[in-house]
Amino acid sequence: MKEIISRHKAGEQIGICSVCSAHPLVIESALRFDLNSGNKVLIEATSNQVNQFGGYTGMKPADFRDFVYGIAQEVGFPRERLILGGDHLGPNCWQNEPAAAAMEKSVELIKAYVAAGFSKIHLDASMSCADDPTPLDPMVVAKRAALLCQAAETTATDEQKRHLTYVIGTEVPVPGGEASAINAVHVTREQDAARTLQTHQAAFRVLGLDEALNRVIAIVVQPGVEFDHTQIIHYQPQAAQALSAWIKETPMVYEAHSTDYQTRQAYRALVRDHYAILKVGPALTFALREAIFALAQMENELISPEQRSRVLEVIDEVMLNEPGYWKKYYRPTWSQAMVDIHFSLSDRIRYYWPHPRIRQSVEKLIANLNNVTLPLGLISQFMPVQFERLSEGVLTPTPHNLIIDKIQDVLRAYRFGCTPDVA
C-alpha cells in the first residue's frame, strides 16, 4: 500500500480498487484478473463479516486469511502481491453494548486482524455505543481510534510494521448498505476532513504513537458517491473540488466507500482528485447474481425440467423463509419486495449464497451446464458482453468462466480508473 500511495503523491494518477467481499468466486475473479498484470490486489473483510467471534461468515481473521490464501494458491497468484485489509474495525458490531465493553472487544478485534497478517487497518470508532450520546464527540472518536491503533502497534512484529498502514475517519452509510432511499448525498467539507486528521494526530500523540502516525495513509471521506436499492448518485467533481484540493497539502490520500456502479470515467476522475482507494463490494456480487440468473435462463432452455437445479426458486424459498438479511431494508409490499430481492443494487442476496440449499442448487446448475454445449446464440441472448469476448477469442464458454468474466466486467471499470495507461 505504501508504494501505491507514494507513487500517487509523487504525481502519478494511480489508485487501487479495494475488493470487499468474502465470496470465493469474487475473490477468484479479482486474483485471476490481475494474475499477469504485476499489480497488487487488495482484499478487505469488514468487522461484521469476520471477527474474533466468527462474524456472519463464521470466519475469524486467521480463517479469512487462510481462505484467501487457499484461493490464491489454486489460481497461482503470488502472496506477496496480496494485501489484506480490515474495514470498519471498531465497535461497529457491539454498538448495543456499553462503550467500555464494546471497546474491549474492539481492541481484541484489532489484535486478531493484525496477528493474522492484515496490513491495511481501518480504525473506525465513530459509532455511538449503548451509553454514548449521538453523535459522538470527534475527540472521543479520535481517542478510541488511538486506543485501537495502540493495540495494533503492540501486536505487530517489526517485519509487519514495515507494511502496516492505517486508514482513519468515516463518512459512510451503515456498513452493509443504505437502509432507506437516498436523494442526495452530503460531500465532506474540507474543514471536517482537517478536523478528523487533527483530532487523530492529537489523540495518537497523547498515547506516544508518533511513529504510527507515519503509517496513516488515508482518510475516509464522502466525495458525493452513493447508491441505494434503485438509484445511483454519480460523482460530480466540481462539488468535491475544495475537498480534493485540501488533501494535496498532506502526505495522505482519500479512501472512498460505496463507489459501486459509478462509470469508468468517474473512477478515473475520483483517482485524479486523490480518492486513490476505491472500495467496491455489492457491485461485484451483483454481477455474480446476474451471471447466475443468466445461467439459470440458459438451463431452462437446455435441461429437461426434472433435471434442472431450480436455483431461482430455491433462492426465493430460502430468502422468504429466512428474511433476516433483507426485510428491514426492502419495500414492504410483496410485489415490490420481490423486485428488490432479485434486482436491488444493494444486493442483499449476497448474504444468502453460503446457504446450503442455495449453494447446492448453484452447484447443480453449473454441473448441468458443464454437461452440455452452450449455444453461442443463447450466450448472446443472456450474456451479450461475454458473447463479444468469446468472439474475440479471449474467453472459453464454460459456466465457471462466464461467471468469472461477468464479475471482471466490474473490475475492468476500476482498472480504467486506477491505471492511467489503460485506454
UniProtKB/Swiss-Prot annotation:
InterPro entries: Aldolase_TIM (IPR013785), GatZ/KbaZ-like (IPR012062), GatZ_KbaZ_carbometab (IPR050303), TagBP_ald_GatZ (IPR023436). The keyword ATP-binding does not apply. The keyword Transferase does not apply. GO terms for cellular component: plasma membrane. It comes from the Bacteria. GO terms for biological process: D-tagatose 6-phosphate catabolic process; galactitol metabolic process; phosphoenolpyruvate-dependent sugar phosphotransferase system. Belongs to the GatZ/KbaZ family. GatZ subfamily. Forms a complex with GatY. Component of the tagatose-1,6-bisphosphate aldolase GatYZ that is required for full activity and stability of the Y subunit. Could have a chaperone-like function for the proper and stable folding of GatY. When expressed alone, GatZ does not show any aldolase activity. Is involved in the catabolism of galactitol. This is D-tagatose-1,6-bisphosphate aldolase subunit GatZ. The lineage of its organism: Bacteria, Pseudomonadati, Pseudomonadota, Gammaproteobacteria, Enterobacterales.
